[in-house]
Amino acid sequence: MSAEKISISLPKELYRELEDFIIRKGIPDRSKIFQIALRNYLDENRDGNEIIYGIINLVYDHEEASEALTEIQHEYNDSIISTLHLHVSEKICIEAIAVKGEKRKLVELNNKLGQIRGILKARLLISFPYEKT
């Protein structure tokens, strides 16, 4: 893989925090941390009509949210690839919804899910499939 070298400036406190993290985790390559962080930042800030993949992570009270959750999932079934459902307790569930579609539509789906009564957490993790060069 060809690479470009760049130089960056960090506030001292952020630099110290980074160095402490690298030592604690035994990370041999500082560049890899920046590559991952930059890809994540770029993914989160892509245009709204690009096709992306993602996971919507939900934590919810199934007694309050299940019916509305199912309705919205059926409304967006063209964007939903798969779901994984976990029972955490008698009341609380976690759901991971794998999605693909235009970013703006997936953000809209995540926002709608987050408005359902009983949803405690709704978070869209965006992934853009990078080709290794």
Curated annotation (Swiss-Prot):
Alphabetized UniProt keyword annotations: DNA-binding, Metal-binding, Nickel, Transcription, Transcription regulation
Cofactor remark from the record: Binds 1 nickel ion per subunit.
Spans traversing the lipid bilayer: none
Biological role stated in the UniProt entry: Transcriptional regulator.
GO molecular function: DNA binding; DNA-binding transcription factor activity; nickel cation binding
Domain of life: Archaea
PANTHER family referenced in this protein's UniProt entry, alphabetically: NICKEL-RESPONSIVE REGULATOR
Coiled coil: none
GO biological process assignments: regulation of DNA-templated transcription; response to nickel cation
Binding residue positions for Ni(2+): H74, H85, H87, C93
Protein family (similarity comment): Belongs to the transcriptional regulatory CopG/NikR family.
HAMAP family documented for this protein: NikR
Protein name: Putative nickel-responsive regulator
InterPro entries: Acetolactate_synth/TF_NikR_C, ACT-like_dom_sf, Arc_rbn_hlx_hlx, CopG, CopG/NikR_regulator, Ni_resp_reg_NikR, Ribbon_hlx_hlx, TF_NikR_Ni-bd_C
Cofactor: Ni(2+)
